[in-house]
């Protein structure tokens, strides 16, 4: 079972896409564990609202828009990090506390890790979507993931504020996870931005070195040889 790092021109039914199935099973196990053992059910539902919509989008559009196995892996890792954070609330995450003790941090930085991962892990799938499915020029497909990461991060912070402050005041502090930092939202957006820049830089560098080829590029090289 080959592991693809670029979008294939051939459609693979979901029932025979074994990597996709493996990622789905892994995520569902983490998701179920986060639900069963959550310390704050109201916060869990708040944190997972967008997850429901995002998973629905991936499933509904699968026949038309299929990502590479690498993209599905990156998406799976990010979603697992997010729902693991929702299990305890970001501010009270055990892994964050452990890292805080080991690295002598002044706060629980698990929320910052997830925001950084939003840009770092999802920039590549976004690039695939713009380059392969929307057929945007390469330079646009490089820039848009960075711009969208910043825009979505800023929008998410506004949604967080609205939901926490207007609708669920009791869960507000836990949901926002600011831990007393008045610049928490700005730092979260910045970390997502940096993550996207690092990811696109790594992929661009690897492609320049010739280590990642799309199926079309491989076919073209075979024809020339």
Residue spans for each PLM region:
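N-terminal membrane topogenic signal
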Residues: 7-23
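Alpha-helical transmembrane segments of multi-pass membrane proteins
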Residues: 30, 34, 75-85, 123-124, ...
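Short, hydrophobic transmembrane alpha-helix segments
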Residues: 33-45, 56-66
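Interfacial helix-loop-helix junctions of multi-pass membrane proteins
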Residues: 40-44, 95-96, 110, 153, ...
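Membrane-interface loop-to-helix entry segments
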Residues: 43-50, 106-126, 182-197
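Membrane-interfacial alpha-helical segments at the cytosolic side of multi-pass membrane proteins
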Residues: 53-62, 117-133, 165-171, 190-206
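Internal alpha-helical transmembrane segments of multi-pass membrane proteins
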Residues: 134-150
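Primarily interfacial, aromatic-capped hydrophobic alpha-helices that serve as membrane anchors
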Residues: 182-225
């Amino acid at each position: 079972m080959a592991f693809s790092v670029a979008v294939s021109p051939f459609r693979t039914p979901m029932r025979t896409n074994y990597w996709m199935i493996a990622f789905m099973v892994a995520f569902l196990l983490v998701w179920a564990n986060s639900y069963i053992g959550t310390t704050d059910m109201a916060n869990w539902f708040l944190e997972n609202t967008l997850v429901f919509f995002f998973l629905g989008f991936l499933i509904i559009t699968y026949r038309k828009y299929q990502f590479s196995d690498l993209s599905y892996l990156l998406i799976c890792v990010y979603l697992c990090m997010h729902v693991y954070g929702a299990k305890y609330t970001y501010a009270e995450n055990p892994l964050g506390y452990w890292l805080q003790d080991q690295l002598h941090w002044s706060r629980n930085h698990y929320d910052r890790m997830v925001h950084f991962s939003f840009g770092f892990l999802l920039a590549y799938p976004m690039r695939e979507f713009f380059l392969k499915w929307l057929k945007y020029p390469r330079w646009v497909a490089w820039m848009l993931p960075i711009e969208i990461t910043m825009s979505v991060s800023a929008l998410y912070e506004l949604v967080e504020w609205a939901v926490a402050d207007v609708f669920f005041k009791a869960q507000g502090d836990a949901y926002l996870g600011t831990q007393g930092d008045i610049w928490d939202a700005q730092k979260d957006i910045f970390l997502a931005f940096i993550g996207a820049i690092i990811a696109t830089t790594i992929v661009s560098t690897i492609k320049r070195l010739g280590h990642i080829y799309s199926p079309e590029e491989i076919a073209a090289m075979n024809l020339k040889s």
